[in-house]
């Protein structure tokens, strides 16, 4: 459950370390984003010589949330923190590696590149 002003960890090697959500995309009054939703973020902390730098405004897809995701069988998958993967203008990941697990729900949102790069799909 991500909303405006939420700080997220970055789960790829794009060069960003922490980002802040500045808008939830998908409707003029949409308040919350969950796993698989695209948000607009600004880079708050970045590493030197990375692909993105502090202050950049990018799209990102949410891959892990503390709120978790509810499955059809009644189970819930929760994570210890909120994390996102940076996207370019074509909705493709900027980084070439994904860190940490991601959920199967990204498959239904057609983020197959993220699924294939992830070390573990829950």
Curated annotation (Swiss-Prot):
Recorded GO CC terms? cytosolic large ribosomal subunit
What are the recorded GO MF terms, alphabetically? large ribosomal subunit rRNA binding; structural constituent of ribosome
Extract the Gene3D superfamilies matched here: Ribosomal protein L14
One Pfam family linked to the record: Ribosomal_L14
**Is Transferase included in the keywords of this UniProt record?**
no
Q: Name one GO biological process term.
A: translation
Q: Which UniProt keywords apply?
A: Ribonucleoprotein, Ribosomal protein, RNA-binding, rRNA-binding
Keyword RNA-binding belongs to the record: yes
Quaternary structure and interacting proteins, as annotated: Part of the 50S ribosomal subunit. Forms a cluster with proteins L3 and L19. In the 70S ribosome, L14 and L19 interact and together make contacts with the 16S rRNA in bridges B5 and B8.
* Family recorded in the similarity comment: Belongs to the universal ribosomal protein uL14 family.
User: HAMAP family, per this entry?
Assistant: Ribosomal_uL14 (MF_01367)
Q: What does this protein do?
A: Binds to 23S rRNA. Forms part of two intersubunit bridges in the 70S ribosome.
What protein is this chain from?
Answer: Large ribosomal subunit protein uL14
């Amino acid at each position: 459950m991500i909303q405006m002003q939420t700080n997220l960890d970055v789960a790829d090697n794009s060069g960003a370390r922490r980002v802040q959500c500045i808008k939830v995309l998908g409707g003029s009054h949409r308040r919350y984003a969950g796993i698989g939703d695209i948000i607009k973020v600004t880079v708050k902390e970045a590493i030197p010589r990375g692909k993105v730098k502090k202050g950049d405004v990018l799209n990102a897809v949410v891959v892990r949330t503390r709120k978790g995701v509810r499955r059809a069988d009644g189970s819930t998958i929760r994570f210890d923190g909120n994390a996102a993967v940076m996207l370019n203008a074509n909705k493709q990941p900027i980084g070439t590696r994904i860190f940490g697990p991601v959920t199967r729900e990204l498959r239904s949102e057609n983020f197959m590149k993220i699924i294939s790069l992830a070390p573990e799909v829950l």
